């Protein structure tokens, strides 16, 4: 089934659960400071749902209809590969569980103006695709979160919350020249305009968050999350990505802001954790990844999931 047909087939389904709200259309933003040139994409591209595509999100997603996506989970490049970011490769460094090597990925090392232009470009496309009732979750660190925040403001994308993901099991800082980086930033945002985004408020209070040492049962969820970054062996059975996130984190996003049957967009799919979470939670999904090797890993992970 093509994407357009699949999306149209949901128009007559009952409204989802959640706090009462009006269905309103968010006001679009015109940003004259956006330096991005438009992408020209053939109009004959047809994308199917529940698939990860090899290629550039901005180019391939141009064939998707406006306001067709319920939730976006984005883990874009942090632009952190400036010669000082370390990533563990299993090896023989005593006391730290492995040898440490610098990340040297081309996709994670851009001049500042180029990175801002890239961020504006993909966020503008994400906003176009997001429903007024939808929202997006965007990962970042101190290298990127500030730029993402500014880009959202330039595009009149409203930030709902800034979340601190505290990682108790963070790798130590080997240089002894700075504090150990033990958190990442997550921006939860909607497309702007009237606040019609879905929020499963009762779940945020009463859900099972036993893996979070800071969450108080029965109390409102706060914006500091204590979730371990370790991945179970089955999440890396077919290979791994240097910036791979645990599936449990994407499942939290989904349970807070989506419903079964919703469409989840993953612009930077990597090895597929967010798509795996979407499938396991009963969502439809569509993902994009530029590296064919990671696409293959992601597809193997998805194929290994038992159908409900």
Predicted features and spans:
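Core catalytic lobe of class I
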Residues: 2-10, 27-34, 38-297, 307
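Arg/Lys-rich, glycine/proline-spaced intrinsically disordered segments
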Residues: 12-22
